[in-house]
Amino acid sequence: MEPVDPNLEPWKHPGSQPRTACTNCYCKKCCFHCQVCFITKGLGISYGRKKRRQRQRAPDSSQNHQDSLSKQPSSQPRGDPTGPKESKKEVERETETDPLD
């Protein structure tokens, strides 16, 4: 390490700040410009306030879409509800007609 003049403030030490100003460019050279550029541009870390996105108002067509969903018939259970009962009856009939030896 080079000896630093004790009369200089820490932010004025040589090498503490880059010679050129930071830019909005995201090229590789600018991403490694200084520590701040590397953290914000290179790593994508920013601790500032996040801008709030304004909600977009739903157009009138979305109301019609909701209405069409409510008009659709509700889902019914799949298969014939009497199907399993009939198959049991058929099995019982087969066992009665075919005696076991």
Swiss-Prot record:
Record keywords, A-Z: Acetylation, Activator, AIDS, Apoptosis, Host cytoplasm, Host nucleus, Host-virus interaction, Inhibition of host innate immune response by virus, Inhibition of host interferon signaling pathway by virus, Interferon antiviral system evasion, Isopeptide bond, Metal-binding, Methylation, Modulation of host chromatin by virus, Modulation of host PP1 activity by virus, Phosphoprotein, RNA-binding, Secreted, Transcription, Transcription regulation, Ubl conjugation, Viral immunoevasion, Zinc
One GO location term (cellular component): extracellular region
Renumbered residue ranges of the record's region Transactivation: 1-48
Stretches for region Cysteine-rich: 22-37
Assembly information from the UniProt record: Interacts with host CCNT1. Associates with the P-TEFb complex composed at least of Tat, P-TEFb (CDK9 and CCNT1), TAR RNA, RNA Pol II. Recruits the HATs CREBBP, TAF1/TFIID, EP300, PCAF and GCN5L2. Interacts with host KAT5/Tip60; this interaction targets the latter to degradation. Interacts with the host deacetylase SIRT1. Interacts with host capping enzyme RNGTT; this interaction stimulates RNGTT. Binds to host KDR, and to the host integrins ITGAV/ITGB3 and ITGA5/ITGB1. Interacts with host KPNB1/importin beta-1 without previous binding to KPNA1/importin alpha-1. Interacts with EIF2AK2.
Region called Interaction with human CREBBP, residue ranges: 1-24
Its job: Transcriptional activator that increases RNA Pol II processivity, thereby increasing the level of full-length viral transcripts. Recognizes a hairpin structure at the 5'-LTR of the nascent viral mRNAs referred to as the transactivation responsive RNA element (TAR) and recruits the cyclin T1-CDK9 complex (P-TEFb complex) that will in turn hyperphosphorylate the RNA polymerase II to allow efficient elongation. The CDK9 component of P-TEFb and other Tat-activated kinases hyperphosphorylate the C-terminus of RNA Pol II that becomes stabilized and much more processive. Extracellular circulating Tat can be endocytosed by surrounding uninfected cells via the binding to several surface receptors such as CD26, CXCR4, heparan sulfate proteoglycans (HSPG) or LDLR. Neurons are rarely infected, but they internalize Tat via their LDLR. Through its interaction with nuclear HATs, Tat is potentially able to control the acetylation-dependent cellular gene expression. Modulates the expression of many cellular genes involved in cell survival, proliferation or in coding for cytokines or cytokine receptors. Tat plays a role in T-cell and neurons apoptosis.
Stretches for region Disordered: 48-101
Motif (Cell attachment site): 78-80
Designated name of the protein: Protein Tat
Subcellular localization(s) per the UniProt record: Host nucleus, Host nucleolus; Host cytoplasm; Secreted
Modification type Asymmetric dimethylarginine: residues: R52, R53
Leader sequence residues: none
Binding-site residues, Zn(2+) 1: C22, H33, C34, C37
Pfam families xrefs: Tat
Native source organism of the sequence: Human immunodeficiency virus type 1 group M subtype B (isolate SF33)
Record's comment describing the protein's domains: The cell attachment site mediates the interaction with ITGAV/ITGB3 and ITGA5/ITGB1 integrins, leading to vascular cell migration and invasion. This interaction also provides endothelial cells with the adhesion signal they require to grow in response to mitogens.
HAMAP family xrefs: HIV_TAT (MF_04079)
Binding site for Zn(2+) 2: C25, C27, C30
Compositionally biased residues, Basic and acidic residues: 83-101
Record family assignment: Belongs to the lentiviruses Tat family.
Biased composition (Polar residues): 59-77
Chief subcellular location: host cell
Per UniProt, location of the Glycyl lysine isopeptide (Lys-Gly) (interchain with G-Cter in ubiquitin) cross-link in this chain: K71
GO molecular function, one term: actinin binding
